[in-house]
Every structure is written in C-alpha cells, then in structure tokens.
Amino acid sequence: MSSSTPISLSMQWYQLLKEQDSPVLIYQMGKVGSSALEKSIPKSIHLHDLMSIDAEKQISPVRAQLHNPATNYIKRLLKRLIMSRMLKRKKQVRIISLVREPIGRNISMFFQSLPFWMAAKYLNDDSAVRSERSQLLHEAFEEHVNHQYPLEWFDNEIKPLTGIDVFTHPFDHELGYQVYQKDNFSLMVVRVDKLDQSQKAISTFLQQEVKVQHDNQADNKWYSPLLVEFKRTFHPKVALIEEMLTSKFTKHFFSTKEIENLHTLYYS
C-alpha cells in the first residue's frame, strides 16, 4: 500500500474501492444475515454504517466507550467523507441490503453483544446487581437496546448516501426483493427470509453468479441456550410490539398478513 494511502482506518475497504470501477457493497444493518452474502460475493465491501457516525446509537454505549470515543468519532467521520466521495465518483455502485423483521433483528443484536448490554443494565439499575430475577435479560433488552435503529436505518444510511428513498417505492412482498436506481447507485433490497428464492435475481443484479452460502451462526454461539430460553419466555410489552410492528419500516417491507402473524408471534 502506498504512502499516499489515507492513514489507518481499517483500510481494506479503501484498497478494494481503489481497485474497482463498479464496486459491490453489502450495506445493511447488523444481524440480518449478511455473512451468507459476504462469503458468496468475492471482493464485496461490507458495511453496517457509514453516514451515521454516532457509535452509541448503533451498539451498546458501554461497548462504544471502550473504543476511545473521540478518536473513534474522528475515524468514522474521515471514513464517511473519503468513502462517500469515492463512491460518488465511480462508474456504477451496486448495493445489496437485507432486511429482517425488527423485533427478531433486535433480539439477535442484543445477544451478539450480551455482556455489554448486561453491563449497561447493572450500571443503570442498582437492584439488578443484588437480584437473581430471571427477567433481567428481558429488562435489559427492553430498556437499553436502541429499538429505533432498524426502523431508521434506511433514512439514516441509504438515503443520505444514494439519494434513494426506499419508502417512496412499493415493495413486492411476494417476490421478496426490490431494485432501485438513482444516478450511479443501484440498490437491491432483499428480505432475508426470501434470500434463497432471490438468488437468481441477485445474480442478474450483480451480473455474476451468486450461490448463497449459509453457515448457521446462532446454533454454534456460546449464548445459544440463553437465546432459546429467552425466546421461549420473553413476552414484549405491548408498547414495544406496537412501536415496532406499526412502524413505517415494517408496514413497507411486510404485508398486512405477515404483520398479523408477527403480532400473533409476539403476543403469544
């Protein structure tokens, strides 16, 4: 890498962008199944956030504080400036973004960083330190996770970068994907539960054969038994269910019948 390359910002993305006229981005919120696509699309650039640079809104505030917040903020700001400028100068940029129903997505994100979320619970609730109550996990999830994150992700990330407002275009719930175009940006949004049936469409979109390679991560995680028990016993508060399932995000990407099924799932 040349001495003129920008200083260490986790530079793999920079080198990949520099080498490609028509880069492919797997650009989506975390915990929607991105690892399957990463392994299936060589030389793709994987992003969860670029335009939003406040780490505490995306991950546990406790975890964010472990990474020198001031330095991390500057790094994220520089990455946004450099990458967005490079992307807008490319001949074509293809972006794939997976979506998932938001409550399930937030549960997966919670467990991925479980120690940090529990630390936030203990730091903010003195009674939690002395308690052995089984609902501590439920309380930590409801009280400390930023539940708005998936609902706002497209408005905070895709729209500022590409100018594409996915909510102004109908989404084909049966097909499970939609393609959008603006200037040099092509965006394909795919529902993760429709990923396998969308492989041919993804291949057409990327102009290369794509075979999605699944490796089920959740069953092999250290927290798998806890996650199974959490899902068995967790009954979200009505306010949380309604906030998530009546949101613009959920109504756009899921049909009325599918949302009714999600209500049944989380109210049961």
Can you describe what each PLM-predicted range is?
Residues 1-268:
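Membrane-interface amphipathic segments in extracytoplasmic regions
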